[in-house]
Regions:
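Conserved pre-ATP/AMP-binding loop-to-beta segment of ANL
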Residues: 99-101, 223-224, 238-271, 278, ...
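Conserved AMP-binding/adenylate-forming
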Residues: 299, 401, 435-562, 569-572, ...
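AMP-binding/adenylate-forming catalytic core of the ANL superfamily
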Residues: 169, 173-194, 209, 398-401, ...
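Adenylate-forming
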Residues: 147, 189-208, 229, 338-341, ...
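AMP-binding/adenylate-forming catalytic domain of the ANL superfamily
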Residues: 224, 637-662, 674-698
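Structural core segment of the AMP-binding/adenylate-forming
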Residues: 161-247, 411
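Conserved AMP-binding/adenylate-forming core of the ANL superfamily
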Residues: 38-42, 103-157, 174-179, 245-247, ...
Length: 698
C-alpha cells in the first residue's frame, strides 16, 4: 500500500507528549533530532541519557538520587539501573489527590462503582495500616485471586506502598492452576473474592478456596471481598487460616505513607503461561516497571490527565499491570469484569449525557462502603427510549460512549469477532472522544486494520502493540506522531534496541527472523523466583544468542521503521524446510466468512512436516469439499502454495490461555501423542480432547 491508513495532523503532533519529549531532549543535550526515527536512534545509542531523560521528563520522585544511571551496560543479563536510587512505585500512582475520577469499575451485570483519586488514596491508607499491623514487610508477598475491580487496585497499591510483592490470578483459574503459581511464592496474605460472574453465571468461590488454602504454606491471613452476589462465609476458612472481611480492613484512613525502596525492589511476580510445565515466576522491579510504563503510557500512547483509558483484561494477564500504571499520568481508568459479549442486565448511560453526568454525579457515585452500590445514571425506561441496550457483541463498544473513553484497548481476536458479527460502531455510536485503539494478544491482521478505520472512525491512532509478561511492557507499539501503515506495528519502543536476526545471529534488514533486543532495558525481569544461580532465567532468554535477549517472536522489520509479527518462533511451521509464521495463515483464513477461528500446526509426516489447519465454523456450517477448496484458494491466492494446509479439519472449540491466546504447542503435542504438562493454564482445557486421535491425521 502506497499510502498510510492514518497520518496525524500537524497540530496533533505538536501537541503530543512524544513531540514535547523530543524537544526536551534536543534542548537538554544540544541536539537537533528532527523526527521519531532520529529520537529512537539516539535513545538506543545513548541509553543512560535516554532513561535519565524519561525520569526527569515525568518528574520521577527519587527519595535518594542514583549514583549512576547504568552500570555493567554491556552485560545482559547483569546490567544495573539507577544504582543507589530509592523511590516508591505506589507513590507515583497516587500523586494526584483531588476529586477527579481515578477508577470506574463496571461489572458484567452493569453495576458501576467509582473512586476519585482522593478516595483511592484513603482506601489504600486503610488497607496499608492493616497490612502493617499484620507485620507485612518489604519483600513479603501479597497475592490476590480477584476480578478486575477497584478492590484489586487498592490491594496492589497498599502492598506496593510498603514494599511487599504483588501477584494476582483471576478467579476463573482452576484450583491447581492457582496452587501452581501461588504455591511457589508462598504469599503471606491472600485477598480473594467470595464469588464472581461470567457469561451470565454466578460462581461461588468457596469450594475452590477450600481446596487452595491448605496448600499455601506460610499464609498468615485470608481477606475475603464480597463480590458477584455471593456473601462470604468466613467461618468456612477460619479453621485453616485467619480470615477477615474486606470491609473490616479497608475503610478510608487518611493518607498512606510510602516506604522509600531501592530502584530494583521487587514489585510484581507474573507467570508464564505454563502450558509446557509449572509456570515460571517472573519477578519485576518497581523502578524499571515505573519508567517503562511512564514512557509507554505518556509518550507512545499519549495518555494524560484528561484521558479515560480502558483495556479489556483480567488480573491474570500482564495488561492489568500495564493498565493500572495509567494512574501515574493522572488518567481515569475504566475497569471491566466479565464477558465482553454478555448484555448488561442494568442499562448503561445515555451516550449524549455521559460527560456531564459523570461530573454531576461524582459524589453521588463515590464509594463509602463495599456494599453501597451506586445506581446507573439512567433508569431502564430512559435506556429503552434511547435504544442504548444493543447486541451482546457491542457491550464494550457501549462503554466507549458511556464513559467517554479516549483510549480503548482490546485484543486482535476481539476486533476480528466484531467484524465477523457485522458490528459497525461508527453507525451506532458517537465515539466522539476516542483518539486511539490499542490491540495486542496476537498479531492484528492487515484486514483488522482496515476494519478499524472503516468501522470505528478514520481519525484515530490504531496501535498494534507487542511485548509480553516477560518484560511487563512492549518491544513495539504506537506512536502518535507517525503514520499508521496497514498490518504494521508503528515503531520500536524508545530505548529498546529491537532487531530481527537470522539463525546465525546476523541482523536482517529485510525478511523474517527472530526478534531480539541487543541492549539492556530497565524493565527486564530481576529474575525468576527461587532461581538462585540464574540458570533458568539465562536459558529462557539468553541461551540462543549469548548476551542478547531473544524474545521468541518471529518478526520482520518494515521500510517505515515498524515491525510485523508473524507469530511465536516455537510455533513456526516448517514444511519442506520453509519457515512460515502461523499468523500469515490466520490472516488469510479470517477472510473466509464461514470460519470464526483457526489454529495451524506442523505435523511430522513421512519424514517431513505438513501443515494442518483446524477451523471453528459458524453455527450451521459444515466443512464440505467446497468450503475446503475456498479456504485453500484464499490462502494460495494471498500467500504462497507453501502456506496451503495439507489437511483442514473442523473442530467445535480451540484451546486458549486465560488471556485469550490460542495454544498451538499444546495442540501440536496432543496430535503427536505427547503430554500437555499443565492444562490448568488453559481457559478451556477440555478442548484439547477434540484433537486427540483424529482419524484424518493418522
Amino acid at each position: 500500500m502506497s499510502e498510510p491508513l492514518w497520518r496525524p495532523a500537524p497540530e496533533r503532533v505538536a501537541a503530543s507528549r512524544m513531540d514535547a519529549f523530543r524537544r526536551f531532549v534536543n534542548q537538554r543535550h544540544g541536539l537537533a533530532l528532527a523526527d521519531y526515527a532520529a529520537l529512537h536512534q539516539w535513545s538506543v545509542s545513548a541509553v543512560a541519557d535516554f532513561w535519565q531523560a524519561v525520569a526527569d521528563f515525568f518528574a520521577v520522585d527519587f527519595s535518594a538520587p542514583p549514583t549512576r544511571v547504568l552500570e555493567n551496560a554491556d552485560a545482559m543479563p547483569g546490567a544495573q539501573w539507577f544504582a543507589g536510587a530509592e523511590l516508591n512505585f505506589a507513590a507515583h500512582l497516587l500523586r494526584r489527590r483531588d476529586d477527579h475520577p481515578a477508577l470506574v469499575a463496571i461489572s458484567e451485570d452493569g453495576q458501576r462503582e467509582q473512586l476519585s483519586y482522593a478516595e483511592l488514596a484513603a482506601r489504600v491508607a486503610g488497607l496499608q495500616q492493616h497490612l502493617l499491623a499484620l507485620g507485612v514487610q518489604p519483600g513479603d508477598r501479597v497475592a490476590a485471586l480477584m476480578p478486575n475491580t477497584w478492590q484489586t487496585v487498592v490491594g496492589m497499591l497498599a502492598a506496593a506502598s510498603i514494599g511487599a510483592v504483588w501477584s494476582s490470578c483471576s478467579p476463573d483459574f482452576g484450583a491447581q492452576g492457582v496452587v501452581d503459581r501461588f504455591g511457589q511464592i508462598e504469599p503471606r496474605v491472600l485477598i480473594a473474592c467470595s464469588g464472581y460472574r461470567y457469561a451470565g453465571k454466578q460462581l461461588d468461590m468457596s469450594c475452590k478456596l477450600a481446596e487452595i488454602l491448605p496448600q499455601l504454606g506460610g499464609l498468615q491471613q485470608l481477606i475475603v471481598v464480597p463480590y458477584g452476589g455471593v456473601q462470604p462465609c468466613l467461618a468456612e476458612f477460619a479453621s485453616v487460616v485467619s480470615t477477615v472481611h474486606w470491609d473490616h480492613v479497608s475503610q478510608p484512613a487518611g493518607s498512606p505513607a510510602f516506604t522509600a525502596l531501592p530502584f530494583a525492589q521487587p514489585l510484581y511476580i507474573l507467570y508464564s503461561s505454563g502450558t509446557t510445565g509449572v509456570p515460571k515466576c517472573i519477578v519485576h522491579g518497581a523502578g524499571g516497571t515505573l519508567l517503562q510504563h511512564l514512557k509507554e503510557h505518556g509518550l507512545h500512547t499519549d495518555l494524560g490527565s484528561e484521558d479515560v483509558l480502558f483495556y479489556f483484561t483480567t488480573c491474570g494477564w500482564m495488561m492489568w499491570n500495564w493498565l493500572v500504571s495509567g494512574l501515574a499520568l493522572g488518567a481515569t481508568l475504566v475497569l471491566y469484569d466479565g464477558s465482553p459479549f454478555e448484555p448488561a442486565s442494568r442499562p448503561l448511560k445515555n451516550v449524549g449525557e455521559a460527560a456531564s453526568a459523570r461530573q454531576k454525579q461524582a459524589k453521588k457515585r463515590s464509594l463509602h462502603g463495599v456494599n453501597e452500590h451506586s445506581e446507573p445514571v439512567f433508569n431502564a425506561a430512559k435506556a429503552t427510549e434511547v435504544g442504548f441496550q444493543r447486541s451482546a457483541a457491542e457491550r464494550l463498544i457501549d462503554l466507549i460512549d458511556a464513559e467517554n473513553i479516549s483510549i480503548f484497548g482490546t485484543s486482535a481476536k476481539y476486533l476480528a469477532a466484531l467484524e465477523k458479527a457485522g458490528v459497525e460502531p461508527h453507525r451506532s455510536h458517537q465515539l466522539s472522544r476516542l483518539k486511539a485503539v490499542l490491540s495486542t494478544g496476537s498479531p492484528l491482521a492487515h484486514e483488522g486494520f482496515d476494519y478499524v478505520y472503516r468501522s470505528f472512525k478514520p481519525d484515530l491512532c490504531l496501535s498494534s502493540i507487542s511485548g509480553g509478561t516477560d518484560i511487563v511492557s512492549c518491544f513495539a507499539l504506537g506512536n502518535p506522531t507517525a503514520p499508521v501503515w496497514r498490518g504494521e506495528l508503528q515503531c520500536k519502543g524508545l530505548g529498546m534496541a529491537v532487531e530481527v536476526w537470522d539463525d546465525d545471529g546476523q541482523r536482517l534488514s529485510e525478511g523474517k527472523g527472530e526478534l531480539v533486543c541487543s541492549k539492556p532495558f530497565p524493565s527486564m525481569p530481576l529474575g525468576f523466583w527461587k532461581d538462585e544461580d540464574g540458570s533458568r532465567f539465562n536459558a529462557a532468554y539468553f541461551e540462543r544468542f549469548p548476551g542478547v535477549w531473544a524474545h521468541g517472536d518471529y518478526a520482520e522489520e518494515t521500510p517505515h521503521g515498524g515491525l510485523i509479527i508473524h507469530g511465536r518462533s516455537d510455533a513456526v511451521l516448517n514444511p519442506g524446510g520453509v519457515r512460515i509464521g502461523t499468523a500469515e495463515i490466520y490472516r488469510q483464513v479470517e477472510k473466509v466468512e464461514a470460519v470464526l477461528e483457526s489454529l495451524a500446526i506442523g505435523q511430522q509426516w513421512q519424514g517431513d512436516v505438513r501443515v494442518v489447519l483446524f477451523v471453528r465454523l459458524r453455527d450451521g456450517v459444515t466443512l464440505d469439499a467446497a468450503l475446503e477448496a475456498e479456504i485453500r484458494q484464499v490462502i494460495r491466492a494471498n500467500a504462497t502454495p507453501r502456506h496451503v494446509p495439507a489437511k483442514i479439519i473442523a473442530v467445535t472449540d480451540i484451546p486458549r490461555t486465560r488471556s485469550g491466546k490460542i495454544v498451538e504447542l499444546a495442540v501440536r503435542n496432543v496430535v503427536h501423542g505427547l503430554p500437555v504438562k499443565n492444562t490448568d493454564a488453559l481457559a478451556n482445557p477440555e478442548a484439547l480432547a477434540l484433537f486427540r486421535d483424529l482419524p484424518g491425521l493418522q
